[in-house]
Amino acid sequence: DDLYQGIQTFYYDSPEREINTERTWLNDTIQGKEISFYKSGNIKSEGEWVNNLESGIQTFYKDSKFNEIDYTKFFENGNLIERRIALVIGNENYEQSPLNNPVNDATLIAESLKELDFDVTLVTNVATEDELEDIIYDFGEKRNRDYEVGFVYYAGHAIQIENENYLLPTKEEYDSDRDVEKNGVSIQNIMKFLEAQREDQLNFLVLDACRNNPFGNRSRSGGNSNGLAKISTPSGSLIAFSTDPGLTAPDGDGDNSLYTNSLSKNLLEPGIPIEQVFKNVYT
């Protein structure tokens, strides 16, 4: 029928003539599996495709034995599908200085992100440092492997000690700076978990924190009465605070903080670039 059928193999222009790409054709269209190789012979990717490579799944492996997935990409009609994942945390049930709104705030943001096609994990009142670190680490691993956009939102107590910022789980003790450094979770370390691993990844960290000072005068640094310290932003990331560095943010008189209420509304405004969303929130 003069239709192209069979397997097409591409080679590197090298003495070893290692396979670059192998494709399967049916009725003049590329169908089925495509396998690509590194020059060393290690398999780089394996994809399942339909309609001349316009739609399908591409899986990248770390070695030629397909033992460990590096990351995956999804395509539809020739375009990369932007997959989105979010981790939303609300901590309010503190034994020292409980808060009123973080769980409501986290729930509101989670609902807004779901409307924007994010795969959302909502956790509330995370009790310990180990638990909070595990949640963030697991999220970072999943984001790096399967998603192009990562969004982390935190509402609750946070504090700076000597220009290092810490998120505070609900059931730890914070009677001194040493307690904070031991029992809090460093935001700077969190950014290492969340840093973009590929050029096509984008990450957001939103902190509606430093609402009041849970320590009184027990901390030599003044606790979070001085707000949070400025954070260096890694490549491919955007960090947003509910207030300027060095200042505190109110918990809010209603069901939600002023910042989160504004953020939720602006996230759902159609056609607004994400940078403009946060500018609108601050105004």
Where are these regions (language model features)?
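Active-site-proximal C-terminal subdomain of hydrolase catalytic domains
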Residues: 102, 123, 203-283
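A short, flexible beta-alpha/helix-coil linker loop
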Residues: 92-95, 173-175, 212, 245-248
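Short glycine-rich His-centered loop
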Residues: 83-97
